[in-house]
Amino acid sequence: MSALKEYYTNECVPALKDQLGYTNPMQIPKIEKIVLNMGLGEAVQNPKIVEGAAEELTKIAGQRAVVTKAKKSIATFKLREGMPIGCRVTLRGEKMYDFLSKLVNIALPRVRDFRGVSPKGFDGRGNYSMGIQEQIIFPEIDYDKIDKIKGFNITIVTSAKTNDEGRSLLRLMGMPFKK
């Protein structure tokens, strides 16, 4: 069992139970999955960019990235249906906790001028989304081997019913929110 999962079970669950006033431990919010998504608009001109991006996302997540394809053709963007336009990874279970631990303890502190993540990234149902501008904050990415600095989105899906429950859960898990 990963250290963060153990911490969640032993520390976060009792704290959330008291804080939110739940009686049943199954009512307590938990993290269900983490989705990493990298959309590449420049892949329209150069489809080979997607392969490199998928490789980088695979290194960051520790799980193979899936290439996403365009659902519709859009003439103004010179986009055809079925063209590769990005990649994504969905993490669950052990890998999800390992990634969250790496994000909070290693990657986020390496962001330039980091003062905490925005508390406005909640969607109304307790899920949190944030953007990473540079993939080089992760230790798996070698700065000399990348062709271009790319950003990606991280969505943390929780079983929380409200934003406040989701915020409490993530704060207890170590997510550094801005004051």
From Swiss-Prot:
GO cellular component: ribonucleoprotein complex; ribosome
Biological process (GO), any one: translation
Gene3D superfamilies membership: 3.30.1440.10
Record has RNA-binding as a keyword: yes
Keyword set, alphabetical order: Ribonucleoprotein, Ribosomal protein, RNA-binding, rRNA-binding, tRNA-binding
Pfam (any one): Ribosomal_L5_C
GO molecular function: rRNA binding; structural constituent of ribosome; tRNA binding
Matching SUPFAM superfamilies: RL5-like (SSF55282)
Range of residues in the leader sequence: none
Function: This is one of the proteins that bind and probably mediate the attachment of the 5S RNA into the large ribosomal subunit, where it forms part of the central protuberance. In the 70S ribosome it contacts protein S13 of the 30S subunit (bridge B1b), connecting the 2 subunits; this bridge is implicated in subunit movement. Contacts the P site tRNA; the 5S rRNA and some of its associated proteins might help stabilize positioning of ribosome-bound tRNAs.
Subunit structure: Part of the 50S ribosomal subunit; part of the 5S rRNA/L5/L18/L25 subcomplex. Contacts the 5S rRNA and the P site tRNA. Forms a bridge to the 30S subunit in the 70S ribosome.
Protein family (similarity comment): Belongs to the universal ribosomal protein uL5 family.
HAMAP family according to UniProt: Ribosomal_uL5_B
Stored NCBIfam families: PRK00010.1 (NF000585)
Protein name: Large ribosomal subunit protein uL5
Organism: Desulfotalea psychrophila (strain LSv54 / DSM 12343)
Gene: rplE
